[in-house]
């Protein structure tokens, strides 16, 4: 390819569909039965209503409108290049497809992005790369397995060579969705880069 554009929704659904077609189970069921239950990891992809009481609401800070309006009043050529890149990204087709259009309802209204992740629909959905829910201990346990060669307590999750392949740089450069930042990606992981150490 000639460019990169972060898109968690597409990436997760593509891999989830491969799992479903090869194995027959949804990605949430597969993760639960093959990883979470086996390694006692408190993490789920797609919640049951009974899990909601354990789930904290996300509270996102919206950009202060006075800051946005301040930058809109300044001629573009006077803005620092980083601010110009952010503005260009927010108005780009790629950004809108990745983060705005997905929130449209059937009547074409854009849902409140700050409230959407707290809805029952979002929490129940199995969105492989975007809405896993887990405890801090569960996330730490999962990544401790990966950081220790893919095994724990005599059970193997991944081979070391698979982990090495997943964390090998496959894509780098200005990202068309993430504000033209110099991000690096492996196979499923954002890698160490100036803006994402």
Describe each PLM feature range.
Residues 1-196:
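Short, surface-exposed loop or secondary-structure junction motifs
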């Amino acid at each position: 390819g000639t460019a990169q554009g972060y898109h968690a929704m597409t990436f997760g659904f593509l891999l989830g569909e491969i799992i479903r077609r090869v194995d027959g189970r949804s990605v949430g069921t597969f993760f639960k039965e093959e990883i979470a239950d086996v390694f006692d990891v408190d993490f789920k992809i797609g919640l049951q209503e009974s899990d909601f009481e354990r789930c904290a609401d996300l509270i996102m800070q919206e950009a202060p409108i006075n800051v946005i309006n301040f930058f809109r009043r300044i001629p573009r050529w006077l803005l620092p290049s980083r601010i110009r890149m952010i503005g260009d990204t927010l108005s780009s087709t790629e950004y809108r497809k990745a983060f705005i259009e997905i929130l449209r309802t059937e009547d074409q209204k854009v849902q409140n992005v700050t409230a959407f992740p707290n809805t029952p629909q979002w929490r129940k959905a199995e969105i492989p790369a975007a809405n896993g829910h887990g405890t801090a201990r569960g996330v730490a346990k999962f990544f401790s397995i990966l950081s220790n060669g893919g095994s724990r307590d005599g059970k193997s999750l991944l081979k070391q060579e698979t982990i090495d392949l997943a964390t090998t740089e496959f894509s780098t450069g200005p990202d068309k969705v993430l504000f033209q930042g110099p991000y690096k990606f492996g196979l499923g992981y954002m890698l160490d880069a100036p803006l994402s150490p």
